[in-house]
Design a protein with these regions (language model features):
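Glycine-rich NAD(P) Rossmann-fold beta1-alpha1 loop
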Residues: 135-136, 161-168, 228
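Glycine-rich beta-strand-centered segment in the early N-terminal region that forms part
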Residues: 30-46, 56-97
Length: 295
């Protein structure tokens, strides 16, 4: 028997003809898909993808009506899986949430047990959603670079889109771990905040989006790119030999205009960060680190 009330409030996006109607309304429990864990949602973060899910031209939503929200955190109120007891604090993000399955902008949610992450001690639901999908992706990027051998002594690391959620969190994590981090941003008024997060230097948008040679001077020991096609060509042609960039964004465009030379002459690596489908075991391990050494 469900512990979710027969009706509850949720933000709903409903496609009608060529437009999307959205607003907070009563939603019926029977409209939620099946799942082993029922959660009283306490917090959800707002992501770029959530905005796209509420637009007629967003190309994100796969069902209509849809409760957006690609992440959520809250309290277990019922569970068919012994790993999750009533009253436990948990989170879920990625997979199909807020895309082809109702998401976190709701008072209640029902999800598969295989998507649920127990919150580590010391990390509240609010803390978890302050980090959110963006912070998780940032941590995933830093870990991917370090798993390839990146260390603070190797030299400067570039973060593009540093004013955004992924970029800003990556900047803070890297700086806290002792790296010399340079922040690229299109918002000059953000320099003070980026310096406070730990940026050793600032690059303007023009410096990282202009055309260049197939290979430019080697500069970066590693990079986190949260923008996409607008900045990634610059990053690739300025990475040092053997360096890597962890890429997760497409707000600056999806079509990548580059050459093979960074790959075949300098051996650089382009690491794709897929936080949506990351296996649950690794996902849980990374959230444990976000409560400890990556916090």
């Amino acid at each position: 028997m469900t512990a979710i009330p027969s009706t509850f409030r949720a933000l709903v996006a409903d496609k009608v003809d060529d437009r999307v109607e959205r607003g907070v309304r009563e939603f019926r429990e029977i409209e939620l898909p099946p799942g082993e864990v029922e959660i009283r949602v306490a917090w959800s973060s707002v992501n770029y993808k959530d905005g796209l899910a509420t637009r007629a031209d967003g190309k994100v939503a796969r069902i209509s009506p849809l409760i957006p929200g690609i992440d959520l955190a809250g309290e277990v109120i019922a569970s068919q899986d012994p790993a999750f007891v009533v009253g436990a604090s948990v989170l879920a993000h990625g997979y199909e949430l807020g895309v082809s399955r109702h998401g976190g902008f709701s008072e209640y949610e029902r999800v598969p047990a295989g998507w649920v992450v127990p919150l580590a001690p010391g990390l509240s639901p609010r803390d978890a959603m302050s980090i959110g999908t963006a912070g998780f992706t940032a941590a995933m990027s830093v870990v991917a670079l370090e798993e390839r051998g990146l260390e603070p002594a190797d030299g400067p690391v570039l973060v593009t889109g540093a004013s955004g959620g992924v970029g800003g969190t990556a900047l803070a994590i890297l700086a806290d771990r002792g790296y010399e981090v340079w922040a690229a941003t299109g918002k000059p008024d953000e320099e003070g905040r980026l310096r406070a997060l730990g940026a050793a230097g600032i690059l303007g948008r023009d410096e990282v989006t202009g055309e260049g040679r197939p290979l430019d001077s080697e500069r970066w020991a590693g990079a986190v790119d949260a923008v996409g096609a607008a900045t990634l060509p610059y990053v690739l042609r300025t990475l040092r030999t053997g360096a890597a960039v962890a890429a997760s964004g497409n707000a600056g465009g999806a079509k990548l205009d580059t050459t093979v030379f960074p790959f075949i002459l300098r051996g650089v690596a382009l690491l794709g960060m897929d936080s949506v489908n990351m296996p649950i075991t690794r996902r849980r391990d990374l959230w444990d680190r976000l409560a400890t050494d990556l916090r």
